[in-house]
């Protein structure tokens, strides 16, 4: 009944004011600007671009804000390689300089990146940062490092969250599940196919393992390396596994930026109210190949003929705001130029 009422009332889909819309466009411009700069400056280098699901960046900004409003002190993120560089810079807060140093040579020591021993490829690194939330103080953000074993990080993040939830309490009191919140970002193919996903979900509601709910994002670019969904899973949706555990799933169009934020508001409210998992299936596409050295038109020629012509979510939203008279196309281009200027500095 609670979930039904929330959806029917559209309380999670409030009318956004001009300031909030401008901020959303800024976040989209930053996400797209970073990817486009790296594509030009380091042509062919692997980075596993977020392009096609760029809305993840403003979604993470908002979910962290909502977690802080519910009493959260720390967010622990787990994800594979796709989009990690964007999350490291725009969510965790490492500098562009530290990120670009990873493209130039040996790992930079002394920054925010979690680097030890001989180091690792840039899209495996973790990092720690903080964010100031207006009126609420500071919230800690940690992105756990991850190997190329995609969903390997799921139980690790759950374990990190559970241990820290107990550290926030005293005298053996119950864990504070509102203080420490885990967020997992899955790939669509891996989420449906890898057993560790089901194993972690199976533990989520057990007294000895529960973390008070994980917020899940599926970066659904509708292809797994070169495999189409119909050839990679026996279910309609990449998120169908969650149905077996009674976990709510919300499918959202990655090109509808404001709807993406509405999904986040509902997910955060559900997790806070029920202390249980929630899944957002962010349905988009992958603008380049599996990595930037691949040519996807060899294996998905018709799909990539369409993707090449398709505008980015930033461009779509900029057009929407221009039509609404909130931000002109010239102002949107100025915002793009400002992001590019920061990256060139």
Predicted features along the sequence, with ranges:
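Conserved internal helical-beta-strand scaffold that buttresses enzyme catalytic cores
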Residues: 1-197, 201-214, 219-230, 234, ...
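Conserved phosphate-handling catalytic cores of large alpha/beta enzymes
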Residues: 224-235, 243-289, 293, 297
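Active-site-proximal loop->helix
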Residues: 240
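A mobile, often basic/glycine-rich helix-loop segment
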Residues: 299-304
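Flexible glycine-/small-residue-enriched beta->alpha junction loops
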Residues: 305-311
């Amino acid at each position: 009944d609670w979930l039904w009422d929330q959806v029917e009332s559209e309380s999670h889909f409030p009318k956004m004011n001009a300031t909030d819309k401008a901020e959303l466009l800024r976040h989209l411009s930053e996400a797209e600007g970073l990817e486009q700069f790296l594509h030009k400056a380091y042509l062919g280098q692997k980075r596993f671009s977020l392009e096609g699901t760029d809305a993840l960046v403003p979604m993470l900004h908002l979910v962290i804000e909502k977690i802080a409003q519910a009493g959260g002190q720390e967010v622990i993120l787990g994800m594979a390689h796709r989009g990690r560089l964007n999350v490291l810079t725009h969510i965790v807060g490492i500098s562009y300089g530290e990120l670009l140093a990873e493209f130039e040579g040996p790992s930079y020591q002394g920054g925010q990146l979690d680097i030890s021993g001989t180091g690792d490829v840039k899209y495996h690194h973790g990092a720690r940062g903080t964010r100031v939330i207006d009126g609420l103080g500071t919230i800690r953000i940690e992105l756990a490092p991850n190997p190329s074993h995609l969903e390997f990080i799921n139980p690790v993040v759950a374990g990190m969250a559970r241990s820290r939830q107990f550290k926030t309490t005293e005298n053996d009191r119950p864990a504070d599940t509102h203080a420490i919140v885990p967020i997992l970002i899955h790939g669509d193919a891996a989420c449906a196919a890898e057993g560790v996903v089901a194993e972690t979900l199976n533990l989520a509601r057990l007294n000895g393992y529960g973390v008070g709910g994980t917020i899940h994002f599926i970066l659904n670019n509708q292809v797994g390396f070169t495999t189409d969904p119909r050839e990679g899973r026996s279910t309609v949706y990449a998120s169908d596994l969650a149905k077996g555990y009674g976990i709510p799933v919300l499918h959202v169009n990655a090109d509808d930026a404001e709807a993406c934020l509405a999904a986040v508001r509902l997910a955060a409210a559900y997790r806070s109210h029920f202390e249980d998992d929630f899944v957002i299936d962010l349905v988009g596409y992958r603008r380049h190949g599996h990595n930037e050295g691949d040519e996807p038109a060899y294996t998905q020629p018709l799909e990539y003929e369409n993707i090449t012509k398709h505008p980015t979510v930033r461009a779509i939203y900029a057009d929407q705001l221009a039509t609404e008279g909130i931000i002109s196309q010239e102002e949107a281009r100025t915002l793009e130029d400002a992001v590019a200027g920061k990256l060139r500095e």
